[in-house]
């Protein structure tokens, strides 16, 4: 049986013991509470399905706890919607209040909600709820590097610096500052940092510097480069959804190459 992306992520993350049990919610009241927050916040979600890593944007619209059913928004592409209806299980990821929520959908069908097309699925029997510090980081490729433009603090020269990402998660990233002249200080917050995700889009985040250290670039005479570890101080749900889509794509590409 093919492994889902959730299986890949759970296996890859070393600090989540017992197959994510610490972060899994299995009580009916706990599950409904998390899902209601998603509805109340109108949280944007991404639904992944199939071995090819297909996905579409969605949102949780309604819950019927008596029937054990939930309604999800219909995707914008009818061809993808029809493909999604042919599979037995979906994996849904959302970020209400910047907390990662992840669950599987089963018994999926088409319905109508408030006069428009929608999906009907069974309420999950469990879900994962993980804070930012718990996100798994994935190494970004060197062949198609991810770039980030960081506006420096007032009084700094130059006013911006472009760095290359070394790894990325929905909770933060590590970047390589090749010239080492940016004078990043641990604890400083940099706003409106622009990350360009190849074939996905551009996201803007605020980040806090966690650690600055010499970078191991593999070049003997490279004494300037520094590795800067950051956590996201502020990232909207849409930005987190785009980052998650990019991470998922990298995971699938790495799986195919292995």
Swiss-Prot record:
Keyword Nucleotide-binding: yes
GO cellular component, one term: bacterial-type flagellum basal body
Top-rank taxon: Bacteria
Boundaries of every PilZ domain copy: 131-248
Keywords noted in UniProt: Bacterial flagellum, c-di-GMP, Nucleotide-binding
Protein family: Belongs to the YcgR family.
Protein name (record): Flagellar brake protein YcgR
Native species: Nitrosospira multiformis (strain ATCC 25196 / NCIMB 11849 / C 71)
